[in-house]
């Protein structure tokens, strides 16, 4: 094979001086099939082919039967230089590691630095951290890559400054001196060899100079001898070409041997045919032979200075047992194996087996998608019958069917041995089911075996039928049971449903009734709301009336006060003297009374006697007596007496008892009640009890100056306080009442209201009575009884009651 270089020396020098960056070179490794002509010589056009395009069909690529390897893109791999193909770049012979830049199922692309890139990298002082520029690429087949890429360089080995060392990139870094190299050395070609004796050292020095100068000086094609892997090289050839190259190859020895053989044949023929030839003829033959020898010597001498012609080469591929190529080397073994593997996969995918074969046309159309070479495909379809692909347990079989079409299928590889051991001559015989080694293979035995199998199958079918009948009977029984259960469950669920429907109806009725009740309540609520609004309006009216009544009561109280002042103030002095006299008379009379006995009034009523009190009885002689009972109620109720009843009054005490007392002109009435109304009385609507509590004149002045005082409870009078009370004139007294009525005094008209109470409490002096208050009475006119009653100095207004 020829080894081609990338570019001549001038091209390398131009790339070195060019400011533009050189394009990345690509090299392709492809095995070329040796097509022999009829005369046995090689086609010279194949030797002149250089870089091939990578886009070749599958049939043109070198394939391998091994499994597809997985490569890491961007990883560094060590290469095995012994497995490099002959057409690999010369730069790659000195490179230790390469980088996988891409791979497919057919080829692998590796990148590596050229010697120019290494020289520029190691000569630069600030070296790049990423290493030299990988400006060279080599595309190899996946089969070659599996052999060449020995191992992957681990990432731990790439740590540090390992990539800055020349021993990492080069196999023998001692052969290269990058520091001493210069661009001038690149332009200087190596001197040509002068003599034949100096060829070997000149060639070695030229090789070293070429490696240093990155291919400079390589413009001449040289012929080398390539020994294939299928033949064992001789010891001399292996010693002469340790690296695969032989710079000197002489063809003269072969030519001389051929000439010698020809001469010997001629001599033998001449000796046999022309034994009686003359001496002159012998001389001519000797002269011719000598001339041939001299001519051959001259040719040999001339050929030592000329470039040798192409040596006839012939690739011989060893044929294995059963190889359909029969020693022919039209296609490589790798392509054969790949094509066979493709056919095997296709037939397996179609399920081709005995009894279900695949037709030739369908198999060929499917195989054309994977095998581009139709010649190889047709060759395999014709000669692959009976072959077992490498690494497979199936054998290719083919034959013509009854219609004359070719059909293909796969059978186990050990079936041929089974036929041989069984002694079957039929190449398409397949053991029947249940056949064992040693069984009879005759047709009768086969029929008996088939009959036996049929009987067994019939028994099994009968058993299956019985089982099916049993299952059907069980199924019928289960259907009956399930039907009865379903009916019972249906009836129970129907009853429950009816109950639920009834309950639902009841609930609906209740809901409707509740809805009616709710509507009724809503109506009532509206009515109540209206009533509340009306009551609210009435309440407002009542409040307004109450305000008016309070104003009326205030005006009435002011009129009573003015009346009191008119009655009491002009006679303060006379009243004091009369009171002293009455007290003295009363004390003198009470000394003769026996304590502890009950006292009676003129009317016969019994008065409860107290241990420490005296009874004051007012007779016709108007003598004041000491009272022997205590007033326990906080206040007294006095009614206006009738004018026609005279001076008779009813005294109400703490026990709510009344006794009539004959009032004289000088008698002081304590309490009076008039159940009847005279003909000249007030109207019934104005009749109301009035409570009047009268204090002493001094207290009255103090009370009127300081304002009205309404204590929570009225006080009762004791004996000492009663003695101090001044006697008031009787209603029939000519001294007071007559003058009062004669003077034209008129009682103001009372309004239509109830609950009027006039009180006055003596708060100037402490009271020793049980009720804690001292009261003094004054007589006023009673509107209902047309008489005069005892009236106090304070008017208490009670809340009116509305009917």
Curated annotation (Swiss-Prot):
Keyword Cell cycle: yes
Signal peptide: none
TM spans (from-to): none
Region annotated Disordered, chain positions: 21-64, 264-333, 651-688
Cell compartments where the protein resides: Nucleus; Chromosome
Bias-annotated ranges (Basic and acidic residues): 39-50, 283-295, 314-333
GO cellular component: chromosome; nucleus
Segments of skewed composition (Basic residues): 296-313
Record's compositionally biased regions (Polar residues): 51-64
Residues in coiled coil: 450-567
Main location: nucleus
Keywords on record: Cell cycle, Cell division, Chromosome, Chromosome partition, Coiled coil, Meiosis, Nucleus
Role, per record: Plays a fundamental role in building the proper chromosome structure at the beginning of meiosis in male meiocytes. Required for the transition from leptotene to zygotene in meiocytes. Required for homologous chromosome pairing.
Name of the protein this chain belongs to: Protein AMEIOTIC 1 homolog
Gene: AM1
């Amino acid at each position: 094979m020829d080894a081609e270089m990338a570019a001549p020396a001038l091209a390398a020098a131009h790339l070195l001086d060019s400011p533009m960056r050189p394009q990345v070179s690509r090299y392709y490794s492809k095995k070329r099939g040796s097509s022999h002509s009829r005369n046995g010589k090689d086609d010279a056009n194949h030797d002149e082919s250089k870089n091939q395009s990578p886009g070749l069909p599958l049939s043109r690529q070198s394939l391998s039967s091994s499994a597809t390897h997985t490569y890491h893109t961007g990883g560094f791999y060590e290469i095995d230089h012994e497995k490099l193909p002959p057409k690999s770049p010369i730069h790659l012979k000195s490179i230790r590691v390469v980088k996988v830049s891409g791979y497919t199922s057919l080829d692998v692309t590796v990148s590596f630095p050229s010697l120019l890139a290494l020289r520029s990298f190691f000569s630069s002082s600030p070296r790049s951290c990423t290493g030299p520029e990988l400006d060279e690429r080599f595309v190899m087949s996946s089969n070659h890559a599996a052999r060449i890429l020995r191992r992957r360089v681990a990432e731990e080995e790439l740590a540090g400054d390992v990539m800055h060392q020349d021993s990492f990139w080069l196999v023998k870094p001692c052969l290269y001196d990058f520091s001493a190299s210069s661009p001038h050395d690149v332009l200087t070609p190596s001197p040509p060899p002068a003599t034949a004796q100096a060829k070997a050292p000149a060639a070695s020095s030229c090789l070293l100079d070429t490696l240093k100068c990155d291919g400079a000086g390589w413009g001449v094609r040289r012929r080398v001898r390539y020994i294939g892997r299928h033949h064992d090289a001789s010891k001399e050839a292996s010693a002469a070409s340790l690296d695969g190259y032989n710079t000197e190859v002489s063809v003269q020895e072969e030519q001389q041997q051929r000439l010698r053989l020809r001469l010997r044949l001629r001599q033998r023929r001449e000796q046999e045919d022309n034994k009686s030839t003359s001496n002159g003829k012998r001389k001519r033959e000797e002269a011719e032979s000598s001339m041939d020898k001299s001519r051959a010597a001259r040719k040999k001498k001339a050929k030592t200075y000329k470039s040798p012609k192409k040596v006839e080469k012939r690739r011989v591929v060893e044929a294995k047992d059963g190889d359909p190529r029969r020693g022919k080397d039209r296609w490589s073994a790798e392509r054969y194996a790949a094509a066979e593997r493709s056919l095997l996969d296709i037939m397996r995918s179609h399920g081709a087996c005995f009894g279900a074969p695949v037709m030739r046309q369908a198999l060929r159309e499917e195989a054309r998608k994977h095998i581009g070479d139709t010649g190889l495909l047709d060759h395999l379809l014709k000669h692959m019958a009976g072959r077992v692909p490498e690494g497979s347990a199936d054998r290719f079989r083919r034959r013509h069917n009854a219609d004359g079409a070719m059909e293909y299928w796969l059978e186990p590889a050990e079936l041929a041995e089974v036929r041989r051991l069984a002694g079957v001559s039929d190449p398409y015989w397949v053991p029947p089911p249940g056949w064992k080694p040693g069984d009879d293979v005759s047709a009768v035995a086969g029929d008996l075996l088939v009959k036996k199998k049929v009987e067994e199958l019939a028994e099994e079918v009968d058993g299956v039928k019985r089982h099916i009948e049993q299952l059907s009977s069980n199924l019928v029984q289960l259907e009956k049971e399930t039907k009865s259960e379903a009916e019972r469950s249906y009836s129970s669920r129907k009853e429950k449903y009816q109950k639920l429907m009834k309950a639902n109806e009841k609930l609906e009725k209740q809901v409707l009734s509740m809805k009616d009740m709710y509507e009724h309540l809503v109506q009532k609520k509206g009515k109540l709301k209206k009533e509340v609004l009306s009551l609210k309006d009435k309440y407002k009216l009542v409040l307004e009336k109450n305000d008016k009544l309070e104003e009326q009561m205030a005006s009435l109280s002011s009129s009573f006060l003015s009346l009191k002042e008119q009655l009491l103030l002009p006679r303060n002095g006379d009243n004091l003297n009369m009171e002293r006299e009455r007290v003295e008379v009363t004390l003198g009379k009470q000394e003769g009374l026996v304590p502890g006995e009950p006292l009676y009034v003129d009317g016969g009523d019994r008065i409860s006697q107290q241990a420490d009190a005296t009874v004051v009885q007012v007779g016709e002689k108007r003598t004041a007596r000491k009272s022997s009972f205590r007033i326990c109620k906080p206040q007294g109720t006095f009614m206006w007496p009738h004018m026609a009843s005279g001076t008779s009054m009813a005294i109400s005490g703490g026990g709510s008892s009344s006794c009539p007392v004959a009032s004289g002109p000088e008698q002081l009435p304590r309490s009076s009640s008039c159940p009847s109304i005279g003909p000249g009385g007030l109207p019934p609507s104005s009749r109301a009890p009035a409570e009047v509590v009268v204090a002493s004149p001094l207290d009255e002045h103090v009370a009127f100056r300081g304002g009205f005082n309404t204590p929570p409870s009225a006080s009762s009078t004791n004996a000492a306080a009663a003695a101090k009370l001044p006697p008031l004139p009787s209603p029939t007294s000519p001294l007071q009442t007559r003058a009062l009525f004669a003077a034209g005094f008129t009682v103001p008209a009372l309004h239509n209201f109830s609950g009027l109470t006039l009180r006055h409490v003596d708060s100037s002096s402490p009271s020793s009575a049980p009720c804690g208050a001292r009261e003094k009475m004054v007589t006023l006119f009673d509107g209902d009884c047309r008489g005069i009653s005892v009236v106090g100095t304070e008017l208490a207004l009670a809340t009116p009651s509305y009917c």
